[in-house]
From Swiss-Prot:
Lineage: Bacteria, Pseudomonadati, Pseudomonadota, Betaproteobacteria, Burkholderiales
Subunit structure: Homotetramer. Part of the p-toluenesulfonate methyl-monooxygenase complex TsaBM, comprising the reductase TsaB and the oxygenase TsaM.
Record-annotated membrane-spanning stretches: none
Gene coding for it: tsaM2
Record-annotated disulphide pairs: none
Record's protein name: Putative toluene-4-sulfonate monooxygenase system iron-sulfur subunit TsaM2
Gene Ontology molecular function, alphabetical: 2 iron, 2 sulfur cluster binding; metal ion binding; toluene-sulfonate methyl-monooxygenase activity
Protein purpose: Involved in the toluene-4-sulfonate degradation pathway. Does not discriminate between the sulfonate and the carboxyl substituents and can also be involved in the p-toluenecarboxylate degradation pathway.
Signal peptide from the UniProt entry: none
Single biological process term from Gene Ontology: catabolic process
Residues that bind [2Fe-2S] cluster: 47, 49, 66, 69
EC number: 1.14.14.-
Length: 346
């Protein structure tokens, strides 16, 4: 089951233009476009006349015109023109989905529009902060979004799936501190400190110091599918665990966002930020490619996992102690689903 009464990312703000864009969210076909005044709109991608996709049409000043028989639908989804017919039937309309543009992202609400409150959109992102250089990307997964969330909340796989990028030997054994906040829709914070440890290859490749480091991974997950990461490495003994960040420390901020496409496919947007050498384009490309390589390592494993789950959906997974973080995440997600099915907010 998929949570509907929540804000999902529908894309980067730059994805939406005067050219119709077809996407699927939570098994629903949606068309995204901008009106003549630049306002982003999300409508059901299905003309109510003969069920042709509106995304094959054209955006005009009055709205989007279906290419099959020429009906025009405005930004609210109402039909405002039928070629050759003056009277418009009262049922000639398509569903409009609430859509908000914030932090350089498009946020869509697929559930009950009466419950869509933009104030509920996660606000603690680094996108657009002048002291951070942010670069974004997109990956399409042939896998259920929960498998991606499980992977992100699981630190121990770093040693095995990412031995040459993000992982170190200590990643497999160090236990995290897990804090669960059940106010509102909930939040999960997972913290790990690696003191006097080796840096990962990704950090080592950009660090301006050598030797051992005090490394941190602080993850904040907001259900159903948004993860903010604060990661970095500082020279050992320079006060990083107490909050001090010396100038030579390597600091990254990362946002990972998943939106279910179907039960077995997912959208994945990410924003990678750093606060050093902001104008170094060669370094930007180096870091970006390193992140992409690590994500492809994850995707290979997760998509293979989905294939097996699709073949034997009733085969149980046997939990181990290292699953504590992802199990807490699943608990919060189940809580949202139960609240939605019961018709009350958590």
């Amino acid at each position: 089951m998929l949570v509907k009464n929540t804000w999902y990312v529908a894309g980067m703000a730059t994805d939406c233009s005067r050219k119709p864009l077809a996407r699927t969210f939570l098994n629903e076909k949606v068309v995204l476009f901008r009106t003549h005044d630049g306002h982003a709109v999300a409508l059901e991608d299905r003309c109510c006349h003969r069920l042709a996709p509106l995304s094959l049409g054209d955006v005009e000043d009055a709205g989007i015109r279906c290419r099959y028989h020429g009906m025009v639908f405005n930004a609210s989804g109402a039909c405002v023109e039928i070629p050759g017919q003056e009277q418009i039937p009262p049922g000639m309309c398509v569903r409009r989905f609430p859509l908000v543009e914030r932090h350089g992202l498009l946020w869509i609400w697929m559930g009950d529009p009466a419950r869509a409150n933009p104030d509920d959109i996660v606000d603690e992102l680094w996108n657009g902060a002048p002291e951070w250089r942010t670069d974004s990307g997109y990956i399409h997964y042939q896998a259920n979004y929960q498998l991606i969330v499980d992977n992100l909340l699981d630190f121990t796989h770093l040693a095995w799936v990412h031995p040459t990028t993000l992982g170190t030997d200590s990643a497999a054994s160090l236990k995290p501190v897990i804090e669960r906040d059940t106010t509102g829709t909930g939040k999960l914070t997972i913290t790990r400190w690696y003191l006097n440890d080796d840096m990962s290859n990704l950090h080592k490749g950009v660090a301006k110091f050598e030797g051992k480091a005090d490394r941190w991974q602080i993850y904040q997950w907001s259900p159903p599918a948004l993860l903010r990461m604060d990661t970095g490495s500082a020279p050992t003994g320079t006060g990083a665990p107490e909050g001090r960040r010396v100038p030579e420390a390597v600091q990254f901020r990362h946002t990972s966002i998943q939106t279910p496409e179907t039960e077995t496919t997912s959208h994945y947007w990410f924003c990678q930020a750093r606060n050093f050498d902001l104008d170094d384009e060669a370094l930007t490309e180096k870091i970006y490619q390193g992140v992409v390589v690590a994500f492809e390592e994850d995707r290979t494993m997760i998509e293979a996992q989905q294939k097996i789950l699709s073949q034997v959906p009733d085969r149980p997974m046997v939990p181990i102690a290292a699953d504590a973080g992802l199990n807490q995440g699943r608990w919060l997600l189940d809580r949202l689903l139960k609240a939605e099915n019961g018709g009350t907010a958590p």
